[in-house]
A protein has these predicted regions:
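Nucleic-acid endonuclease domains
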Residues: 1-81, 89-307
């Protein structure tokens, strides 16, 4: 039986000859068995990263190597000895996995994981739990599998979660939705579900995965996690709902206290656009310098400083 612990990433280095061998196997597997069906399927690179994560997990759990001829289902990658169906999820990036990251307002943002809604809502994809991983790769120009023996690749084992809890608590974002990444934003090109790392079940070691049984899955299905938003976005949304007359300052103070955030949060739009609007209101005679001075205490204009 599994014993809950807070998620803490487990790094597995995929370097030297041993790591290269695993990367070579992932490359060979995807080359021989590309997934060319299904809407919004993963790219060849994404399929390669997913295969590598599964190959690594199988190796460290003492399981047989990945084999397309005896894969039990499209919905999951392997069965645990307890009968639990596991799907390994992997996201690749050039940075190591961090549980929190700083933006340029020095306020931490919590890390998240991503799911495809079409998989989550397809009952034919029979799976009990997802094992969430993150693959640190070389630069985008040089990270094509299998890479080289000298390159540094690291797989982070982040934790696990039941499919049913992701369906219940994850936040669905339609294609084109905006999300924050580091010091900038991007829009999702595909439909997405965000689920935050802090809400995963942690693993002290990878072989602890073998202890998960149906009672653990049921307990996770019933578990109530925290917000699947960054604390910063929760405050931004609260500000917006106050402006729309739905919430009030009591809710803002509550969320700020719960998140332990006292700094001013940077807006999504440029602060220059805020000042432009305020100056227009002043020209219309609706505000005075007092409001502009107050805004200057909270927001900072961003002058052009050259390329």
């Amino acid at each position: 039986m599994y014993q809950y612990s807070k998620p803490k990433p487990i790094p597995i280095k995929l370097i030297d000859s041993a790591g290269f061998d695993l990367r070579q196997k992932a490359f060979q597997f995807v080359s021989a068995n590309p997934n060319t069906t299904g809407a919004e399927r993963g790219s060849e690179e994404q399929q390669g990263f997913g295969a590598l994560a599964e190959i690594v997990v199988r190796k460290y759990l003492g399981m047989p190597e990945i084999n397309p001829s005896n894969r039990p289902s499209l919905g999951y990658d392997f069965l645990l000895p307890t009968g639990i169906k596991v799907d390994v999820k992997c996201r690749g990036g050039t940075l190591p996995f961090k549980e929190e990251y700083l933006s340029n307002d020095d306020i931490p943002r919590e890390a998240k994981h991503n799911f495809w809604p079409r998989q989550m809502n397809d009952d034919r994809l029979d799976v009990d739990i997802y094992l969430m991983t993150h693959l640190k790769t070389p630069s985008k120009k040089t990270r094509k599998l299998p890479g080289t023996k000298r390159q540094k690749w690291i797989l982070y084992i982040c934790g696990w979660v039941s499919k049913e809890r992701v369906k219940r608590e994850g936040v669905y974002l339609p294609r084109g939705s905006l999300t924050e990444q580091g010091k900038t934003w991007f829009t999702y090109q595909k439909h997405d579900i965000e689920f935050y790392n802090k809400n995963l079940n942690g693993l002290q070691s990878l072989d602890e995965l073998l202890k998960i049984d149906q009672s653990d899955v049921n307990a996770d299905i019933a578990r109530k996690g925290d917000l699947n938003l960054t604390s910063v976005d929760a405050i931004r949304i609260t500000y917006d709902l106050i402006g729309r007359g739905i919430l009030n300052n009591k809710h803002l103070e509550y969320i700020k206290k719960k998140a332990n955030i006292t700094n001013e949060i940077k807006p999504i739009l440029s602060s220059n656009q805020y000042f432009h609007l305020l100056e227009w209101f002043k020209e219309e005679g609706l505000i005075t310098d007092k409001e502009l001075e107050r805004a200057a205490q909270i927001l900072k204009k961003e002058p052009y400083t050259g390329i």
